[in-house]
């Protein structure tokens, strides 16, 4: 049995996805996104084994990762997603983008989750084993 630690870094902010909602539109329902945007918590997780703990008792100092996570969160909150990204910015595609952005700076990154708290739907992009 492999015993591992799992660490999660979280940031909460507002995003404006800006994509059409064909099902809601067909039923003449109002949009789900509030004027101020969806409230989203981004969760960034990484894992490591017991023998990877250093002499300070940690695998990595999470303070060192804050800059990368903050930069990613700021980009997601910086405007309407179709104006920010060159791809169709579904929550799935944006979670994958965030994972790719963070993978180079967060050792052993295992997932990035975008939890849309406004509508109660979370999308998690997970590294496959």
Locations of the language-model features?
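Charge-rich, low-complexity N-terminal segments
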Residues: 1-129
